[in-house]
């Protein structure tokens, strides 16, 4: 009896955070800085800042396969290598091996994952955009899904709080559909992008073209240098891990902040099996954890639990947390748990060559970690489309073709080689980024008949685009070509690649926030309606998807929920 009591005491914390990625790192930082002894659980390996970025300074000739994946490794990652960084030798080590982490695709869904301390914060695209007022109101206005239990004004101060800490380079553009934030100096558009910007401003009253807002430090402030972070070197090798700490990641930012408090315990190699629910107390008391190396099961205890294992895994943990009170998963009184899975629609690509001659003697200098961006303009203000609701944005880029344009060319000889040393024509590209609606039939389920090597049930994912997404794609494809035509850019490729959901790596929903416990899993502070000391603040909590990159919103939701949780703890309400 004494032994069991002593073990429980040693395994008891004020708070437990499940996951160490973008939102999990924020939860750990906020809870420890508010004085809570916090255990952060990570299912994957530990990754130390700088020392565990093995390729961060490697040139192509220093790589065993010159940056390409060897065939035997490529065969193990058929899903992961569909996304850029996983498809090369420089960044593949931050992605899972598909053969070790199987799941069933009822309909095609490309699930990209990074199982290590830091999660996908090590290889994210770093585009950070606030949601706007419409994004939080459209569900209610249009009768789609459930009404968000919060509005933009509830999250605005937390957006500012997060932006100041992570460091966001951007310009105050004064665009209603893309609210301004707390920005460091922006990176600069190149000459063709500036030309495109002027064209858009002259031709359209409702459209804008801007430098993207990115979580790379153009000019660090004191809050950044105090954590050892320095300015972005514009190497564009971000997906290898940044030795300068110039882009926001758990390793560069939230983890060292949490460690400084002396209140954090980090435990890698720890798969959370389930959350322990006490029927008598009516709340969660801890978690069951599988050691990935020994398969030993251990229980840890805390007054509050933050679930930040990334959308699909967070929901899987809730679904696997069954009890007499919750036979269908923790908090699943509504039946919404596992449903309304969303991703962003990145299907359209349009590219072309600028036909003007005024930039032939111009070039861009160095590299840049930020692309350019056309914020959403559809179904806002006076624009109302008859074929679809919501809207899309574009990620854009411009540059001059280099020697790679000679690949596949039948030419040879000295003259050909000499011509390849000169800059090629200016090119421009646009990728559509569309909102996906919360469809009830897009869902995940546990598969009890198929277990992984740790004895956990695998997942079945059933997700597809619907008519609204398909019609939005057609409009995005046409509008991109129209804008490029106005700018004197000859379109050389324009297509819908029909890729399945998942590849935007913005999966969200499945444990949505809402006002009514009968139709949602979480309340306005990301609490499980029926289990108030469990908070879910990653993408699983989203009630709609907007078309902006979602990570900034996850971080703001997490900081807000942590602040609320600690205040409620002090009131003895949790």
Regions found by a protein language model. Give the residues of each.
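Short, glycine/acidic-rich hinge or "gate" loops at secondary-structure transitions
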Residues: 49-51, 169-181, 490-499, 571-574
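A glycine-rich dinucleotide-binding beta-alpha-beta segment and adjacent secondary-structure elements
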Residues: 210-218, 235-238, 273-277, 423-436, ...
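A conserved FAD-binding loop/helix module that cradles the flavin
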Residues: 544-562
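N-terminal glycine-rich phosphate/pyrophosphate-binding loop and immediately adjacent elements
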Residues: 2-139, 144, 149-153, 157-160, ...
């Amino acid at each position: 009896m004494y032994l069991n009591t002593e073990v429980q005491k040693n395994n008891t914390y004020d708070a437990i955070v499940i996951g160490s990625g973008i939102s999990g790192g924020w939860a750990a930082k906020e809870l420890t800085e508010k004085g809570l002894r916090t255990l952060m659980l990570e299912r994957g390996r530990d990754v130390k800042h700088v020392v565990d970025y093995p390729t961060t300074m490697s040139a192509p000739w220093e790589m065993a396969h010159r940056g390409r994946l060897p065939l035997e490794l490529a065969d193990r990652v058929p899903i992961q290598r569909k996304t850029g960084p996983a498809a090369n030798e420089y960044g593949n080590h931050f992605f899972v091996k598909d053969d070790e982490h199987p799941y069933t695709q009822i309909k095609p869904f490309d699930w990209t994952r990074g199982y290590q301390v830091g999660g996908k914060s090590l290889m994210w695209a770093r585009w950070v955009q606030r949601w706007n007022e419409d994004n939080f109101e459209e569900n209610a206005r249009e009768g789609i899904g459930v009404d968000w239990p919060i509005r933009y004004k509830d999250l605005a101060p937390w957006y500012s709080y997060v932006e100041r800490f992570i460091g966001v380079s951007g310009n105050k553009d004064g665009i209603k559909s893309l609210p301004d934030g707390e920005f460091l100096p922006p990176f600069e558009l190149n000459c063709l992008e500036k030309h495109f910007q002027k064209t858009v401003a002259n031709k359209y009253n409702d459209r804008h073209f801007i430098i993207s807002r990115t979580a790379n430090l153009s000019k660090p402030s004191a809050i950044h240098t105090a954590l050892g972070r320095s300015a972005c070197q514009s190497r564009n090798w971000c997906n290898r891990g940044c030795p300068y700490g110039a882009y926001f990641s758990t390793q560069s930012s939230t983890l060292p902040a949490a460690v400084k408090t002396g209140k954090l315990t980090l435990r890698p190699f720890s798969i959370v099996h389930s959350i322990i629910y006490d029927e008598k107390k009516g709340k969660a008391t801890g978690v069951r954890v599988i050691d990935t190396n020994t398969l030993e099961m251990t229980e840890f205890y805390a007054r509050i639990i933050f679930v930040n294992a990334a959308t699909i895994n967070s929901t899987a943990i809730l679904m696997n947390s069954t009890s007499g009170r919750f036979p269908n998963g923790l908090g699943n009184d509504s039946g919404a748990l596992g449903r309304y899975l969303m991703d962003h629609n990145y299907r359209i690509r349009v590219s072309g060559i600028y036909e003007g001659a005024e930039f032939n003697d111009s070039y861009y200098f160095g590299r840049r970690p930020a692309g350019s961006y056309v914020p959403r303009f559809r179904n806002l203000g006076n624009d109302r489309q008859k074929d679809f609701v919501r809207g899309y944005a574009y990620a854009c880029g411009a540059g001059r073709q280099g020697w790679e344009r000679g690949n596949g060319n039948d030419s040879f000889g000295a003259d050909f080689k000499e011509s390849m040393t000169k800059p090629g024509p200016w090119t421009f590209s646009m990728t559509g980024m569309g909102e996906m609606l919360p469809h009830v039939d897009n869902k995940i389920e546990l598969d009890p008949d198929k277990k992984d090597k740790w004895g956990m049930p695998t997942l079945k994912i059933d997700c597809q685009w619907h008519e609204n997404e398909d019609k939005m794609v057609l409009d995005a494809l046409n509008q991109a070509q129209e804008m490029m035509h106005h700018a004197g850019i000859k379109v050389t490729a324009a297509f819908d690649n029909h890729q399945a959901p998942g590849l935007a790596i913005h999966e969200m929903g499945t444990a949505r926030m809402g006002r009514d416990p009968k139709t949602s899993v979480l309340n306005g502070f990301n609490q499980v309606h029926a289990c108030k000391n469990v908070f879910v603040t990653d993408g699983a909590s989203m009630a709609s998807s907007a078309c902006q990159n979602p990570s900034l919103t996850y971080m703001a939701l997490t900081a807000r929920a942590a602040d609320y949780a600690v205040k409620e703890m002090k009131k003895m309400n949790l």
